[in-house]
């Protein structure tokens, strides 16, 4: 777990929830080298109601928060009846250069974690232990992380749990790579079909949020839906940037509109009290946007991708709207917690610095009822020598000497030298330590060791892993440049945020 600024850990808003707020079914989750393991005991609240015919009303819980404040009882339980499918995303061009050498879900997050840890942890905390991750681009680091972070046996029903990476591949039947989200799932339907489950849970690998998928699945079953789409309430200012949905009085989706404006936007207003918002919040948030998260009944998925839409490539723009037009029951499920699509450099930067927010961060890694799991690294505690650190999160194994750090996230194994000033910055840290002898040798030859050099000043920046920042460097973008590509010089500027490339060298005295 990361340390918080001035070594004071703020309490999570949901950390006060006790184990009594947890759910039904004792389960054991075992992680590699016993990094995070233990039993969670849950109390039954009654059997899930199932009906033989169509239920005329959607049974959707009130707006979902970060903590598990209600109980569920799936029958059969999620570990036996649900298969998690996490989509690794495309090439991640909007996140470049962070995706230059890694897949988007493998991008570091919050000092100690990676983006993929979010959906995997949400699955494990929701008793979903059979998980596939579909990837296509730069998947080596993602494969390595998942194999080290999650044991081959994750418990679950009959100890059959797993987290397995499926890379895009060519075959005699299909010589093409993944063409989109639906096509990626279609190409591996032969494998998914072998699992004796009721539903497929389709997730994105680049979202930051905490969600109880068991409640999501329960709403799907109780409404007798073919497909259930997770929906986020929106105000008018944000709504134009999303794909919006319109629902009827039963919460059934009847219309889709991508990035609507003007009169088209007004036409997409819905009564969000139907999905559980109170009257005041429903007035503030009269739109609902798709989160790109779906529960799809197994037989429906097979029918849609093989028979109804064999050429469709995308769930959001083709398969889901097509299912609605065919008259299938496509329901909306409201999620009203924190959610961020980490699709751009600016969104990624803001999401990371959001965890330093006072008094309660946008997203808390300190929620003991729903922990975020990751790879065990067995690093020593961070060492801070005469450092002035405020409103910051410090990862494991850092060495910080006589410097100032404010409103920043400092990743694992970071080395920050005397006199440095770090403000509003995300340091991703390093993959390895350099020995003292290595650093002395580099200094003697005029080289630059990994980390931040003496008297350097960094503000509003992202410093990727293993970067070498020399002495007296200024990365402050004093000219307020919004966009610049300086790959040969080791950095990019996007939305005014300077991003130093992984393994880059910024010589002493450089001003950016």
Curated annotation (Swiss-Prot):
It comes from the Eukaryota. Disulfide bonds: none annotated. Residues 12-21 have a biased composition (Low complexity). Residues 1-63 form a transit peptide. Residues 1-21 are annotated as: Disordered. Its EC number is 2.7.7.27. Keywords: Allosteric enzyme, ATP-binding, Chloroplast, Nucleotide-binding, Nucleotidyltransferase, Plastid, Starch biosynthesis, Transferase, Transit peptide. GO terms for cellular component: chloroplast. It catalyses: alpha-D-glucose 1-phosphate + ATP + H(+) = ADP-alpha-D-glucose + diphosphate. CDD domains: ADP_Glucose_PP, LbH_G1P_AT_C. One of its GO terms (molecular function) is ATP binding. It is found in: Plastid, Chloroplast. Activated by 3'phosphoglycerate, inhibited by orthophosphate. Allosteric regulation. Its main location: plastid. The keyword Plastid applies. Belongs to the bacterial/plant glucose-1-phosphate adenylyltransferase family. This is Glucose-1-phosphate adenylyltransferase small subunit 2, chloroplastic. The gene is AGPP.
């Amino acid at each position: 777990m990361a340390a918080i600024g001035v070594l004071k850990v703020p309490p999570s808003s949901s950390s006060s929830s006790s184990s009594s707020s947890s759910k039904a079914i004792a389960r054991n989750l075992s992680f590699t080298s016993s990094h995070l393991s233990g039993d969670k005991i849950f109390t039954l609240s009654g059997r899930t109601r199932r009906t033989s015919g169509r239920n005329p009303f959607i049974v959707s819980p009130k707006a979902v928060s970060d903590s598990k404040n209600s109980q569920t009882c799936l029958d059969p339980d999620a570990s036996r009846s649900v298969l998690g499918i996490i989509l690794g995303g495309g090439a991640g061009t909007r996140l470049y250069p962070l995706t230059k050498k890694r897949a988007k879900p493998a991008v570091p997050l919050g000092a100690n974690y990676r983006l993929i840890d979010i959906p995997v942890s949400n699955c494990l905390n929701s008793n979903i232990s059979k998980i596939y991750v579909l990837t296509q681009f730069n998947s080596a680091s993602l494969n390595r992380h998942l194999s080290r972070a999650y044991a081959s046996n994750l418990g679950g029903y009959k100890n059959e749990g797993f987290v397995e990476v499926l890379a895009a591949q060519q075959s005699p039947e299909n010589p093409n790579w993944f063409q989109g989200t639906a096509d990626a799932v279609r190409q591996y339907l032969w494998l998914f079909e072998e699992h004796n489950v009721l539903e497929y849970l389709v997730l994105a690998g680049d979202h930051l949020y905490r969600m109880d998928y068991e409640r999501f699945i329960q709403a799907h079953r109780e409404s007798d839906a073919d497909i259930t789409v997770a929906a986020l309430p929106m105000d008018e200012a944000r709504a134009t940037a999303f794909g919006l949905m319109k629902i009827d009085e039963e919460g059934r989706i009847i219309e889709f509109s991508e990035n609507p404006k003007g009169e088209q936007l007004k036409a997409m207003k819905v009564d969000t009290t139907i999905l559980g918002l109170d009257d005041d919040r429903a007035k503030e948030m009269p739109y609902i946007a798709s989160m790109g998260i779906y529960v799809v009944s197994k037989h429906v998925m097979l029918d849609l991708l093989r028979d109804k839409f064999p050429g469709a490539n995308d769930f959001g723009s083709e398969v889901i709207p097509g299912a609605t037009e065919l008259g299938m029951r496509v329901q909306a499920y409201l999620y009203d917690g924190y959610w961020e699509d980490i699709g751009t450099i600016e969104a990624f930067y803001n999401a990371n610095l959001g965890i330093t927010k006072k008094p309660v961060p946008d997203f808390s890694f300190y929620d003991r009822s729903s922990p975020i799991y990751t790879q065990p690294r067995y690093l020593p505690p961070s060492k801070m020598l005469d450092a002035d650190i405020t409103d910051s999160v410090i990862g494991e194994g850092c060495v910080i000497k006589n410097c100032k750090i404010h409103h920043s996230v400092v990743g694992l194994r970071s080395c920050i030298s005397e006199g440095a000033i770090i403000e509003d910055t995300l340091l991703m840290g390093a993959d390895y330590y350099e020995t003292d002898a290595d650093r002395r040798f580099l200094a003697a030859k005029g080289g630059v060791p990994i980390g931040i050099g003496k008297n350097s000043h960094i503000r509003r920046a992202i410093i990727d892993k293993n970067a070498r920042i020399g002495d007296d460097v200024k990365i402050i973008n004093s000219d307020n440049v919004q966009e610049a590509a300086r790959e040969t010089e080791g950095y990019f500027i996007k939305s005014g945020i300077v991003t130093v490339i992984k393994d880059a060298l910024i010589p002493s005295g450089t001003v950016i």
